[in-house]
Amino acid sequence: MSWDQVWIDVNVATMDTNIQGAYGVIPQAAIAVKDGKIAWVGPRSELPEFDVLATPVYRGKGGWITPGLIDAHTHLVFAGNRANEFEQRLQGATYAEIARAGGGIISTVNACRDADEAELFELGRQRLNALAREGVTTVEIKSGYGLNTETELKLLRVARELGEHHHIDVSTTFLGAHAIPPEYKDNADAYIDLVVNDMLPAVIAENLADAVDVFCENIAFNLEQTERVLTAAKQAGLQIKLHAEQLTNMGGSALAAKLGAKSVDHIEFLDEAGIKAISESGTCATLLPGAFYFLRETQLPPIDLLRQYKVPMVIASDFNPGSSPICSTLLMLNMACTLFRLTPEEALQGVTINAAKALGIDNNVGSITVGKQADFCLWDITTPAQLAYAYGVNLCKTVVKNGQVVALPN
């Protein structure tokens, strides 16, 4: 056999659902890579003969290999921070009081409108580097901090550029309907007109988005407004997803299911009818424990019902300056287990195969399966559960992206 590289002396958590047992484990395994793809994976004892002298062989010293991690929900491109608001909230100020004083999401919008692309790119690069050190190989990045055509396009251009210049793959999402900007505060319908008739065509013309998202909530956009945006996006051939049921149960998830959305995200207030709907549509449920933790929420997402209806559960950081300023996918594994009561296996599924499903790329990444992209990580652990168990020491030893061993940034 002719391969570009071979990995031996490893245990592999394939996360391939076709392999029986927890994590899709293959103990004492080997992996072969050819042309950036997984060419062979299985027990070391069954590895076909190959030219050892002509093939780089990597020894894992008994460590574990998992698929490269995927963070399927971030707002990673932004300027400024809201540490002052964090302090104000701890001193008793309400979100409404902060917003009336010019804070909240609008403060980030103003910072992003003022920032140039070079500044936003450098900030985004630093954040991608932080995720890369944790074994992340694919990241979704949303816009949504522009709320006008010029700045929304700027944010998406930066996200695309980050994907072109970093080893991490970047999936971009247009979230123009993230909040109602001050200039439209009394006319949300008119702002949705702008999103549908001006922003979305401009985004499509520059091929800046892989998907479109809307914040469907009583403090943002109603069902009718949400459907307008998602329908227009779907008609344009873009994938759709939804922020839904974070603060109230508005029925956004049922709408998402009707329209064939890839995921509904947050979903603390999702009810059984909504769960049944997304189960039937194949829509993923994206859990965001970082926001739950940072906002000190108390309404837990309906984990048992999601299990009952076999809805794929995704775990993501929701990294953003307001409700989850936590740039760590690994920490989300621990939070998903400790706060939401997921098992370590469910948590790891949530940042591998299920995250890939939420982004519509599970045919190419998310598990260590022959034919898929060779994106994987070598960890200095004794069991995959260790990734969710402990936090603070980086156990990621090596990352392979598209079949190439990458140098992790300092």
UniProtKB/Swiss-Prot annotation:
Its cofactor is Zn(2+); Fe(3+). N-formimidoyl-L-glutamate binds at residues 145, 320, 322. Keywords: Cytoplasm, Histidine metabolism, Hydrolase, Iron, Metal-binding, Zinc. It is found in: Cytoplasm. It comes from the Bacteria. Pathway: Amino-acid degradation; L-histidine degradation into L-glutamate; N-formimidoyl-L-glutamate from L-histidine: step 3/3. The keyword S-adenosyl-L-methionine does not apply. GO terms for biological process: L-histidine catabolic process to glutamate and formamide; L-histidine catabolic process to glutamate and formate. Its EC number is 3.5.2.7. InterPro entries: Amidohydro-rel, HutI, Metal-dep_hydrolase_composite, Metal_Hydrolase. Binds 1 zinc or iron ion per subunit. Zn(2+) binds at residues 73, 75, 243, 318. One of its GO terms (cellular component) is cytoplasm. Fe(3+) binds at residues 73, 75, 243, 318. One of its GO terms (molecular function) is zinc ion binding. Its main location: cytoplasm. It holds the Pfam family Amidohydro_1. It catalyses: 4-imidazolone-5-propanoate + H2O = N-formimidoyl-L-glutamate. 4-imidazolone-5-propanoate binds at residues 82, 145, 178, 246, 323. Catalyzes the hydrolytic cleavage of the carbon-nitrogen bond in imidazolone-5-propanoate to yield N-formimidoyl-L-glutamate. It is the third step in the universal histidine degradation pathway. Belongs to the metallo-dependent hydrolases superfamily. HutI family. This is Imidazolonepropionase.
